[in-house]
Amino acid sequence: MLPNFIYGSYTGLAVTVFGLVPTITAMFGKSILPSLAESCAKNDKKAMQSGLTKMLIVTSIIAIPAGMGIAVLSEPILRFLFGGRETEIQVCIIPMSILGIAVIFLAIATPCFAILQTLGKPHKAIIIMLAGGIIKLFLNIILIRQPIINISGAAISTLVSEVFICVLSVRSVCKMTDLKPKVSEIFVKPTYAAIMCSVTAILSHETLTKIAHLQINHRFVTLFSIGIGSTMYF
């Protein structure tokens, strides 16, 4: 019964939040498809590279701070969304922090799959996902059985799998379009800004939480902290 409860808590709470950000970033992949298809038909690599670069930059600008925010504010976010389910929340705090980092890689890989299909290589996306799934399954078998790791092993295996999938999907897209990604603009700058954003958000949350005599609603504190962090980011 206990293993079922732990796994149910993980899939019902942490995995639910984990799937939100990629749903948003997937739209960027779809939005670029018409112009990408046109560029492919004209064999206009410059237009393809320009569109892909913009897509990767916008996706990173959204995915990196969102993922890091989930990682550092996992407990407040769980309480905000699933208040009253205390035992389940306690089970999911650490796994969701790990999944927060995994969100970044999944969110970046998701639109890349749509692009691979447009470029006429859907089998590459399937192969990459299958390989990532095998890695995840293998690590799940090893890690979840360790008592000290437990259900966090599922989150760790997801993180490793998503890193692998993201690297290969981005590499495939870049290779097929001869794109040399602007690492600084796509990854370094958003990551630095996201770190500042996350630090600001967690400090704001801890400060407001300690001011117990104000009796501030915890949902308001969470929203306010996210808002302050977002202001710092943008």
Describe each PLM feature range.
Residues 5-25, 56-61:
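Alpha-helical transmembrane segments of polytopic membrane transporters and translocases
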Residues 12, 59, 96-99, 103, ...:
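Residue-level recognition of transmembrane alpha-helices
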Residues 25-42, 52:
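Helix-loop junctions and terminal segments of transmembrane helices
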Residues 51-74, 80, 151-177, 191-192:
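Short alpha-helical transmembrane segments in multi-pass integral membrane proteins
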Residues 71-103, 213:
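Interfacial segments at transmembrane-helix termini and the short loops linking adjacent helices
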Residues 101-131, 141:
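Membrane-interface junctions at transmembrane-helix termini in multi-pass inner-membrane proteins
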Residues 123, 133-167, 181, 203-227:
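Membrane-interface helix-loop junctions in multi-pass transport and translocation proteins
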Residues 159-210, 232-234:
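C-terminal transmembrane helix end/exit motif
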